[in-house]
Amino acid sequence: MKIKLLLVCFLGTMFSIQAQNAVKANLSENPGSITGKVIDKKSNEPLPYVNVIVKEADKFVTGGITSDKGVFYIKNLDFKKYSVEIQFIGYKTITKSVTISSDNKNINLNTIAIEEDAIELKGVDIISEKSTIEQKIDRKIINVGKDLISAGATAGEIMNNIPSVSVDPQTNAISLRGNSNVRVLVDGKPSNIDPSQLLQQIPSSSIKQIELITNPSAKYNPEGMSGIINIVLNKNSKIGLNGSINNGVTFGKTPKVNSAFDLNYRNGKFNFYGNYGFNHGKNNNYGFIKSEEVNKENLQNFQFNNLNTSHLAKVGVDYYINDNNTVSFYTNQSFFNGKGFGSTDVDYVNNTTNVDLLQPFKSDGNSHSQTYNFDYKIKFKKEGHSLELEANYNENDNPENAIYTNLNRDTKAVINSFTNDVSTLGKNTIINLDYVNPLTETTKLELGLESRNENTDNNLFRNSAYSSAFTYDRKIYSAYATLGKQWKKWSFQAGARLEQYNVEALFQQASNADGKFEDDILSIYPSTFLSYNPGENNSFNLSFSRRVDRPSIGQVNPIREWSTPTIDSEGNPNLVPQFTNSFELNYTRKTKIGSITSGIFYRRIEDEITRVIFTNPENPNKQVLSFDNFNNNNAYGIEVSGNLDFKKWWSANISLDAYQKKVKGTIETSTGIFEFTEVDATTFNARINNTFKATKDLRFQLFAMYRGQDQGLQFDRDTMWKMDIGSSYNILKGSGTISARFSDIFNTMHFAFNGDRPYTSNGQFNWESQSVYLGFNYRFGSGKNKAIQRKQRDKNETQGGGGLL
């Protein structure tokens, strides 16, 4: 019953959007209108976002949704008899009959009181069984259902089920459309926590939506070549006490546990909410790298384990001063402890010059990230007219200690050892002012200001003779304006963002002269969007935006990130920003069995930032893995995704994408000479997530993914694929769900590469891809919906380095 109501509500919302566009196309043709106000029968409070559907002889005509004050106004109706349905999740549907005539053009239904449906569970949060995908003018929204929640315990695990998104299972580095230059936000806010770590701390059961914004408007921070991934967490605003509990365990080589708890209480003018997530487990990784560098041929076998424990908590309050003024505050607190231990075994093949090495290591790191957010929103008399002030402060303290010992592999004699004590402290302050004014019913103006101040201090201490410090400060001041216009079947939005960017970096070493870097850039970032809706079953969206990827602290920090006997990983302080011009065209078609969206995109990239490996100029026996700017490059591709209901018992989310890129740059060869190199690469990816409904409460999932080969200037990544099966069963009259999943049933998922620059090499990395997950989710509560809307914006820190390739 709940699922049917949810589908009705969702379809009603979609119909209302289309109907409103259709209405605006005929302003002068149909003079009739229907208005009214919807309230809760028990509390007499107005109900926002209620579906109002107008039918003629049981045939859909038009519709709309109520405002924050519960008011609806539907116009441009012919002189006819209609039935008006008032539909809302958890409430009984009410139908009113009206007749619009020349003598009675404007029908006022006055106040309509609706009551909760006694058949429904009292206040239990409704989670759709199946995830859905919505294509908006500037973003793709994935509404997370139980099928995705059961796909994994954390955000990182379910991201691989999302169209166009890939997560490296070894490093947890995230990419969008094959590019790792992507911003990751949580509730539209940034975090100083590295995205690869953040994805492992967010419980999947706490996620409401995932937004893919591949061509953000001028309102958004322009950083991120491939766009923005915004993770929207559940936040109830139901009257009374509501919440959910989620627990799970994953069995790989070792068990891993996760727990999540969400709680909300609203009474009167206050809404209190909070959630807590806990993850603990040991992860096993192993692999090899074979190098055929002349006179240094070697085989590295490595094995390392991570024992990670994380706590992530969010607590907040909304204070509704009155209908037009709302103050909100929340804080995020994240605690993470990671212990690493393992070894690298280096066997120099047919080489008597170099000694075979064994390097055991262990590391211990503790980090604490804290975010404080304040928001004040004023709503003016005119619907949609608002002013919003927001301040956000984030601080991340991340110390780490690592001990490396180099041994003669045969005799086990100690050659040398060293300790790395690294401390990183990052602070980020952001202040925004946003103004929205609907100038007319079809025209909207948005203006805004933003100030960002980011400071990072990174220190390395090995001994009194070898220590270094790196300070990185960024100040960014922005102003933006967008203007949107709708007419008939068309809608258009254009805008621009002006940014003043200033960066200062200082690198100090005990044994060398200080290194300084400064940059000051004034840039403008335009964006345009054009949408055409010829009918309720078809829509076209065309967009353009200019974006920038400024080097992150992980990409410019010259202090070594990690080390093996043959490779050091470090940043490049001489990196310059890369700029991208992005074009995109999408078409959405609604059919009897669901909706299908297809699109094409093109990106022109200037000074592309990418991974590079070269010989260490200070030690020819070692390589340096770092970053560099390559030449101007091009990438274009196609995407197809669909939400399809083949049968009443079988539905599927399907996505296919293919892209081609031309990469150019100057790369070191085996002779030590740097030469210009160019590569044309084509990659194909596919995903399908099937849901099979066996009974009312029992469902099965079958997920499969294929990630095609990818070529780069130095390395080619091999094909990757896997298949998962899972099931979920509703108990306790629908308030509880038991889920199970068997991941990578054929144990095929691993990372493998082949390289030929600067020398021939190949390797493979393995992790606990094959695993079994068992989980239980319980939802409770007593309230009804009354949501508060807060803006979602892009303000994320650029993703850092991490990972080998």
Stretches with model-predicted labels:
Residues 57-71:
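Short, acidic Ser/Thr/Gly-rich low-complexity loop/linker segments typical of extracellular
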